[in-house]
């Protein structure tokens, strides 16, 4: 998806946008992506992340609040590939990913705090479709996410 740079969007729309703290690193082959937010809140358990990515993405961005944990990964190459195959625009993880080299070749936007080779537990714990608060922003299901190399911004709706 071609979109204006986040800096240009900010210049045009200013305070209509919520700008996330600059804490995310780029990992996917797609560096510029946007879409309506689907949200998941988990802690060191990626079961709901997988469940979300198994559904049709329809160009949405899966926003994962992993509590900022650096102790295990919530997304690996298999889940990133699943996201690409199911037409998700991207995944933003407030936590870690793993398999960063294969993910760098998958045509999907992937942002996260860091990498960790340790896999998560799979107990099915967490919540879908909840309002998230991390990186100094609030993200509700259906908000519009804009992301590129300069950062992540959130709007209440898609901007013209």
Located regions from the model:
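Feature captures the catalytic cores and cofactor-binding loops of soluble hydro-lyases/lyases
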Residues: 1-141, 158-160
């Amino acid at each position: 998806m071609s979109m204006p740079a986040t800096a240009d969007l900010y210049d045009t729309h200013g305070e209509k946008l919520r700008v996330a703290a600059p804490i995310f690193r780029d990992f996917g082959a797609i560096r510029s992506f946007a879409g309506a937010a689907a949200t998941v809140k988990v802690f060191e358990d990626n079961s709901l992340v997988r469940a979300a990515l198994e559904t049709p993405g329809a160009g949405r961005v899966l926003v994962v609040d992993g509590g900022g944990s650096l102790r295990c990964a919530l997304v690996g190459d298999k889940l990133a590939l699943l996201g690409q195959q199911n037409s998700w625009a991207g995944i933003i993880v407030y936590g870690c990913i793993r398999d960063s080299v294969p993910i760098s070749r998958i045509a999907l936007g992937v942002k996260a705090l860091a990498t960790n080779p340790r896999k998560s537990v799979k107990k099915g714990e967490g919540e879908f479709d909840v309002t998230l608060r991390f990186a100094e922003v609030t993200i509700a299901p259906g908000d519009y996410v804009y992301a590129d190399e300069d950062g992540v911004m959130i709007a209440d709706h898609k901007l013209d």
